[in-house]
Amino acid sequence: RRLGAEEVRDSVLAAKGTINLEIGGPSVTPPVPDIVLAGSSVKGKGWGSSTPEQANRRSVYVKIMRSMHVPLLINHDMADTDSTCPVRFTTTVPTQALNMLNGQFMNDSAKQFAQRLREEAGEQIGEQIKRALQIVYSRPLQQTEIDKCVAAVNDLIAKHNLNETEALNRFSLLALNLNEFLYLD
């Protein structure tokens, strides 16, 4: 099964190492794109802004407004706040993939994930990739998996004139979009 909306967001927060596991307290308002704020009846009214630490709390604490939603959550079938329903349906639609690749939250998260990899694995790209795969796969790795990813990052550097930082940022975004990260067996 695919992870639910809240599980996807929480997994990304955990992967980048910023999840706040504080229990209880008021709801939080994570950053949302300006286009989402502009769509509310009164631009941004009532949404507020939590500190970065509070915004990284688990998704169960995210403020829910019927007229305004966090894009990642709404695109991944968050609970319908307008009606009661004993079952939450799971869809797989192109907008989910587009949001996961192009959304502000995912791209910012990929950069933070890449920073975590640099801090934990040092400056060797192979070690950074190995650490990324350990985090997203949560299982022992095969050397061929690491080698393929190292080759892909080296291609980004050589063929697309990216520096190592930007190449790792893009690989981090790819890693957070892997099926094995988003689906459970």
Language-model-detected regions and their locations in the chain:
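Glycine-rich, flexible loop segments associated with nucleotide phosphate handling
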Residues: 51-54, 164-168
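Globin-like tetrapyrrole-binding proteins
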Residues: 171
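Short, charged, surface-exposed loops that flank catalytic or proteolytic processing sites
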Residues: 123-125, 158-167
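Amphipathic alpha-helical segments that form the core helices of the histone-fold
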Residues: 147-158
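An acidic, gly/pro-interrupted, aromatic-rich
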Residues: 1-136, 140, 175-185
